[in-house]
Amino acid sequence: MSRVGKSPITVPKGAEISINGANVTVKGPLGTLTHNLHPSVGLKQEDGVLTVVLNNDSPEAGAQSGTARALVNNMVVGVTTGFERKLSLVGVGYRAAAQGETLKLQLGFSHDIIYNLPKGVKAETPTQTEIIIKGSNKQQVGQVAAEVRAYRSPEPYKGKGVRYVDEVVHLKETKKK
């Protein structure tokens, strides 16, 4: 069993967990998430604490225990506090505007980019050059942030483009004669 898989998950108040065989459902103030666990691992719930249990002694079960624990923990955190990714737009004329279920981006192309947000993900634009993507599903929030960044990823000479707030862009030196 992996070290991550051995550590228990504490379930905060406001989160309900129902285990039906390999299907795990977590309900909280920010929504409901479900996940099917690998057949070699299971979950045991007692006194508001979840632990991962191995269904067999195969090496695969030990490897899957850490993955299962991390996924269920992300579900618990997602429905109680949620996840967010912050993006910043660097460049002249680069702007973003959140309009309901869509995100309008001006990234130096001849046309505006309209990005339709998936269900369960929200976007905010506190300023024109800042985007905050929020949601309860960690994978989905990261996927949306990566797709928005892919429209104009930071270029290596001036650093212009869409970048994560905590991202460090290493700039190349220009060619010398």
Curated annotation (Swiss-Prot):
GO terms for biological process: cytoplasmic translation. One of its GO terms (molecular function) is structural constituent of ribosome. It comes from the Bacteria. Keywords: Ribonucleoprotein, Ribosomal protein, RNA-binding, rRNA-binding. SUPFAM superfamilies: Ribosomal protein L6. Pfam families: Ribosomal_L6. The keyword Hydrolase does not apply. InterPro entries: Ribosomal_uL6-like, Ribosomal_uL6-like_a/b-dom_sf, Ribosomal_uL6_a/b-dom, Ribosomal_uL6_bac-type, Ribosomal_uL6_CS. GO terms for cellular component: cytosolic large ribosomal subunit. PROSITE patterns: RIBOSOMAL_L6_1. NCBIfam families: L6_bact. PANTHER family: 60S/50S RIBOSOMAL PROTEIN L6/L9, LARGE RIBOSOMAL SUBUNIT PROTEIN UL6M. Belongs to the universal ribosomal protein uL6 family. Part of the 50S ribosomal subunit. This protein binds to the 23S rRNA, and is important in its secondary structure. It is located near the subunit interface in the base of the L7/L12 stalk, and near the tRNA binding site of the peptidyltransferase center. This is Large ribosomal subunit protein uL6. The lineage of its organism: Bacteria, Pseudomonadati, Pseudomonadota, Betaproteobacteria, Burkholderiales. The gene is rplF.
